[in-house]
Amino acid sequence: MKRLAALMAAALACCTVAHAASSYPAPAEGDYVIRNFKFASGETLPELHMHYRTLGTIHKNHGHVDNAVLVMHGTGGDGAQFLRDIFAGELFGAGQPLDATKYFIILIDDIGHGKTSKPSDGLHAKFPHYAYADMILAEHDVIAKKLAVDHLRLVMGTSMGGMHTWLWGETYPDMMDALMPLASLPVQISGRNRMMRKMMIDSIRTDPEWKNGDYAQPPHGLVGALNILLVMGSSPLQWQKEAPTRDSADKFLDDRIARYMKEDDANDLLYQIDSSRDYDPQSKLSAIKAPLLAVNSADDQINPPELGILEREIKNVSHGRAFIIPISDATHGHGTHTWAAVWKDQLVKLMSETERKK
């Protein structure tokens, strides 16, 4: 599975996005092996290989790291997605909000994603059934044990990474100065969001070609799952602009499904979608200590603002506030979370408000 977040952004952007590597330090890639990792399900993996990327250099103040920034990807994503121009080109360059010559930026491929251990590596449906709690623990191990980072200037994430941001604030409340979840809600996944996820899971599992995860060729049920995935993250405004006729709309869809079928793995997608089953931060929101800014967009069909959930729940976060980005030609539905130009002014404000006095 290439990535839910990038799949959405690519489908919405409908353009080739270049890396802005020349404007910030080159990322360094690394791996960390966690031995005998025990999952919340009770399953164990002898070696959990965690892949990560970092930009910049660690800085310490009185023996403690004071410039680390954790950025977490969405369902099906990886850390590399944040190196695209629409994100890194707006944030990581000199003088930009997360200037990589000033901050130490951490981009981790979560369990089941990117170059980190996942079902398609060989275990297929015998891979441990990981959940968000496992992913948070593994992220923390990479940061604390491999990178020796004891404090985070900022924790932020998009979509699933946004949900992880809420969980980080609850699980490690004294470890960060600020939190910025994007395109997420701090409640159990339910309603239409859960129904769409179940549709994707059922589309794969009920396909005889899936063969309980031991398929040789991609099961056709993956097509149904990808169709739902595309609609979940779509922007009616952007898609109408890109495909204003019947023929262009058909080609738009056919081209993307054909490409994703070559790139994606059914088991990986199945596990990625199912991993949200334990997400339920609502009852512990009061445990969050750091200032938190939750950013969603008005055209996000996964987290539609008319539900009023974010506005209701943010009141339970001591230093929390919410910002809803209005629909415009610059928003891209759920995928707005990766278009940093749309919301980076809010990030600048958060960083300014939480800057420690020297």
Stretches found by the model and what they are:
Residues 133-153:
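Conserved acidic catalytic loop of the alpha/beta-hydrolase fold
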Residues 288, 294-296:
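Short beta-strand/loop motif that positions the catalytic acidic residue
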Residues 53-121:
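N-terminal cap/lid subdomain of alpha/beta-hydrolase-fold enzymes
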Residues 268-284:
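Active-site nucleophile elbow and catalytic-triad environment of alpha/beta-hydrolase enzymes
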